[in-house]
Amino acid sequence: MNKLHFGASYYPEHWKEERWAEDIRLMREVNFTVVRMGEFAWSTLEPAEGKFNFDWLDRAIEKLAAAGIVSVLGTPTAAPPAWLIEKYPDLLAVNENGRRVQFGNRCHYCVNSPDFHAATHRIVSAMAEHFGANPAIIGWQIDNEFNRVCYCERCQKFFQQFLASKYSSLAALNEWLSTSYWSQTYSSWEQIPIPIGAHNPGLMLEFKHFVTASYRQFQKLQVDLLRPHLAPDVWITHNFMGWYGGYDHYEMAADLDLASWDWYVPTGHHDYLKSGATHDLTRGFKRKNFWLIETQPGNVNWVPINNSTNKGEARAMAWHAIAHGADAILYWQWRSALGGQEQYHGTLVDQSGKPRPFYEEAQMLGKQMQLVSDLLAGSRMQARVAMLNSYDSRWSIEFQRHHGDFDYVAHFNHYYRALATNNVGVDIISADEPLDDYQLVIVPALVILNEKRVTNLTNFVQRGGHLVLTIRTGMKDEYNALLPSRQPGALAELAGVEVEDYYVLDELVPLEGNLLSGTSKQWAERLKVLDSNMTIPMARYSKSNGWLDGQVAMAVHSFGRGMVYTVGAYLDDPAQQKLINHILQIAGIRVLETPEGVEISQRVDPNDRVIYFVINHTAEARVLTLPWSGFDHLTGRDVRELQLEPYGAAIVTRSDQETA
């Protein structure tokens, strides 16, 4: 079973080799168990075409291993070197304005370039053959933070081929993408452009699918080169960027062994009610624990105000990530580079080679992680609540927000926060996943319906599940065309309501009900009850624009053995909290009350013992009385009352659950 790992990104190629021993000594003192290396080292690993220089990395891996530190290697394809660009200049990506990007940054490649694929094949094959059997390497990272979209003529041609392989004919494409609108009908595949700006919504959605397919193909090229050379327990990952929306992460994660992500707080301080959702999202990519493979040791360097985290805050952030399923915490980076674009980014060791003040905080965290590594081995979250995430629905909204401030992720987090405030564990999973393990499922803005989604949701409620449908759900088909029926489309019978009309709001609209009163912002749907015997209005709009006055804003419908809540309003925070509190109670989901800013999350070990993470996310001390006696594994003490220092944490098991 996996143990906890603690470490950082390390770039030995930046420093003279005689310095490495001191770096490794400091790493051991800070209780590192792992480093990530190599992901930007292409020009050092292959200084000229086909001329490989792996000796330096061999020595670094060996020296680290001798100190008990294992390695994760990154394939260096995010940083194609100058000699490669000079030989193959059209390897550079083209931006949406038709200009080639400039060498000197990263991820500057066209993901569909055959020359780039050939160069990738060469460097990754050589690394796999050379390093693949090294027992000191426990995992591999493919590339780094996939993000570039290319608009070159080659990508346009491949996009046309992608469409031709998906649609049986141009006639089918024209029909499904509604190209008769504005005389967009295509008579040859070669006429189809890469959509830019306010283009055909169906074609825009297909281009997102094409970008996903392109990156997945490029990633799989590397996975397939690596895997034959790796032991079964050596994993392959890619470092995702949380809620980044450039591609479908479920598709991208399918070929990987492990999901990982890079967590940064640009300005201000972390909000655990928000960041928890991103951890849960990443855990959902593979439905298992993940690695936090990059996070900040202090500040970032790429926003207008790059403030540092408070003393102790990064430690609370680390326990927060682990509580939500992270099995590793790696800081970016170990030491400040003397040059390059990230000179001012936070590190553990400064440009002089001396530890920064943050080093002591990391040292404490590393020691604590060692204390509980065995305790947490094999443990995972077990949630009874799921939230369904849909990239195609998100893209559909982003193409046509209708209200400029309407944001899919913000709306998603609006529901998540109300759950997290109650310390309720949540799985964030694909909208196409089965729902057998849950008591409550929340479906935020599932614009796009398909047969699988309708079937899964219907079966879930039929079996006794509680379902929440929010605004904008069930508007479109999988081609991003409006359904020829009212919202929520094929879910209308399940919901017991249909949307007579929807209204974009330029001001708050009041609503009232027996359960709650409040306001709706940005968006309001006028619900029509289809079966008054089985459907109860929960709230109605008060006087507003005339169209909404007295109309149903929320309703609950009994279906099979379950219940469906349709929320046609974008509720204010207090009303939202009341609604979720009520639904949790009805659904039989246990909540845990804590002082403001204190989180309780749970992991369950292979023996079904619950491990409680109690984390103070504030700069002030907090006191919490547990409803049972327990043992704090960080202090080694029996506890009933927890006195948490600012950003302090406790990892507690119940005394009545202790095993021999």
Spans of model-derived segments:
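Aromatic-lined substrate-binding rim segments of carbohydrate-active enzymes
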Residues: 22-28, 36-100, 222-230
